[in-house]
Amino acid sequence: MKGIKKSPTEESLYLEYSHQTEGCIFPLHTSVTLFLLSYCECKVFNVCLVLTEESTDTSDTSFLKEALPQDLEIQVISKQALPPIVQNCCLPAVVDQPDVFCRAGLAVVLRHIIQKSYEAEPSRKEILELLGFKKTCLKACAEVSQWTRLCELTIPLAVENFLQESSEHPPTIPEEILELERKLSEPVRVHNDDKLRRQKLKQQKAAGSEPPSGKGKAKSKASAQKTPKDLAAPSKSLELKVAFSKLTVQEDAAASNREPSHIRKAKAADLPPLEHVFAEGLYFTLADIVLLPCIHHFLVIICKKFSEKLEQFPLLTSWYQRIQEVPKVKTAASKCGIYFLYLPELLNSARKQPVNSDEVAAVDEQSDPLFIGGPRPTMTKLMEKGIEAMFSPHPCPAWTLDWSSLPAAVSPKEGKMSTDRALRKQQQLNNLVYLVLNQAKPGDRIVDFCSGGGHVGIVLAHMLPSCQVTLIENKELSLIRAKKRSDELGLSNIWFIQANMEYFTGMFNIGVALHACGVATDMVIEHCIQTRASFITCPCCYGFIQNTSKFNFPKSEKFKKTLSYKEHMLLCRFADQTAVQLPPERRLIGKQCMGLVDLDRAAAAGEHGYSVQVISMEPESCSPKNNMIVGVPL
């Protein structure tokens, strides 16, 4: 391990180092990233290990010798040596030269490592396959994706806490591990689900075993007694055949044969469910890469101190044994100090209990009841409590930027959209820019959340050269387009961060968001409140609003006292019905529902010491979603 000089085009990868416990590097995000680098044999990054404030001495690195891949050159630095843009983000993070474009957060960074590794070695198709079907594995943020939340947040944190607690006293098994065990018992859903299930039915018929009948009812005795060893035999599992044929780049010969009539005519409800081979289903993906270091270190402690608890995780241990068969996994693991355990066969406990889809459907129906009727009873209920949609007057409805005098790259027309749409986008920007210009002071830091192609942020950076503007967006291509426009303008007061907004930890004065989808608007407002920053948001996609791990609706006390969650969801559903092709009366109801949903948001922010207004954009025709929520700390 030694210092490395950065080339002008090289990207730097920054990983946090806190400490080691039981041979595991903390935080686990770093262990996971190092394992992926080892699996991909990736050498395209300048890798920097960032010591925490508790251990800032970078001269003595002997304690790291056994913990890091020895074929990977690593530079050890202190937090103070991080580029300014990285100091505003959670690690891991990757930065392009000249330190104005940053990718932060585990999922974003891992996906970028995969893409760069494949670009460096296109012959290794298995690297790109880690991104899964349509290349979407761990692409969605943790707020909307169960797997991203599990892999990026809950499992690493739960295992870290488990490892720390186990050194002092017998810990309890993390609920997150039990949740993962349950998820491995659920039927697999893949894009060619029906085809594979019919192949499995054919296989079972040929073997003389009866498939489960109707909607996930109990499996046959032969199927129920399947052990981990059975699952490791490709001749006995269609799922394994499919999974490992993909890993070895072979074609499944059965796929080209036309199925017999009785197989083709079988009802979908009578088809056997597909079982997990890997974490997300049949294929080895990035999710498995993330989970392996976490689950390995968890199982090490279980086997060493609480071996009697091992039988609680038959599916997890089967997955752990199976993943060792994936080419190059053992080699990559050993380079990272991960030496696989030998786990005894759990003959009795490894029996898989099928998920009863009738029960699942019943639970779903209870947790997500059907919407019945319109919003009028809910609106009347609010009116009886003195709550109505109220809009503050626009402070300057006729104000507009002189778009003709601005450089072409500032205009939304440069964002590859039609002339009509570009005009409406300009009208939307007029509203947000006016409000920001009225609040911004020289030296202020402005953050454009959910920035997309950078329409808001680029205009603000051009109009406010004395302010630092940061664009935060989860979609890489959108942010790359924004940077290209910024480069054409020669802007020097702008940063680009590809990350979920919670991984931005910097201080700022004003937060803006144009058409942040669903709960993203609530996340923006929450982020601004935590920093005591002003906010100007224009919500969108009201129909996607739902309770999450961070938010419960309604949000404000006065709405909570009046409406149930279901009634609030009813307002959200109808708030989305404002499209121009709808009848005027329906659009009016939609606008009122929008106003009520945003009034709840405004009231909740007011409870945190903000002066908040809900204002309609001018002209209102600039967008069906034309509300603005404007908040200033008192």
Curated annotation (Swiss-Prot):
Give the UniProt record's GO annotations in the biological process aspect. respiratory system development; response to lipopolysaccharide
An example Gene Ontology cellular component term from the record? cytoplasm
Alphabetized, the UniProt keywords read: Cytoplasm
User: Which residue stretches does the UniProt record annotate as biased composition, category Low complexity?
Assistant: 204-226
Stretches the record annotates as Disordered: 189-233
The record's CDD domains line, in alphabetical order, gives: GST_C_family (cd00299)
- TM region(s), chain numbering: none
InterPro entries noted in UniProt: Glutathione-S-Trfase_C-like (IPR010987), Glutathione-S-Trfase_C_sf (IPR036282), GST_C (IPR004046), Methyltranfer_dom (IPR025714), SAM-dependent_MTases_sf (IPR029063)
Does the record carry Cytoplasm as a key word? yes
Q: Does the keyword Lipid biosynthesis apply?
A: no
The domain of life is Eukaryota
So what family is this one in?
Answer: Belongs to the GSTCD family.
Q: What is this protein called?
A: Glutathione S-transferase C-terminal domain-containing protein
| Gene field | Gstcd
